[in-house]
Amino acid sequence: MSARPGSSTRQLTESVDIFPTLAELAGLPAPKGPQPINGISMVPVLKDPGARVRDHAFHAYPRGKLGRAIRTERYRLVEWRRPGEPEKNAQYELYDYHVDPLERENLAAKNPGVMKKLKATLASYPAPFSRA
């Protein structure tokens, strides 16, 4: 490793990145299995805190409805809907961390361009399963 102790980074990461990162640090081959490994090794960021390996992070959170979110350095888009429910019934939250780091003002209705871009990124992730 070449990053100085105490270094910080602005690189977004997710808990699914831990496994591929540890595997690479241990010198093991890239993890493979019957289910896809969604994480990305963060070793490049450990070596150079300025390195970038992705431009967003994805997470999902159940709270009555399923909240699926895309987080970029600037924005967080959250989509709330029940599994199997059509997208037209979804509720959205959009926050701009440059001016509202505490997520107090939902900008979803005010930023259609940002919404369109982040919704397209969100659509690249598997839709939640529907309950029969």
Language-model regions: role of each:
Residues I70, M115-L118:
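Hydrophobic packing residues in well-ordered alpha-helices of helical domains and bundles
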Residues D100:
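Intrinsically disordered, low-complexity polar regions and short flexible loop motifs
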Residues A3-R4, Q11, V16-F19, A23-Y97, ...:
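C-terminal cap/loop subdomain of S1 sulfatases and analogous C-terminal strand-loop tails that border
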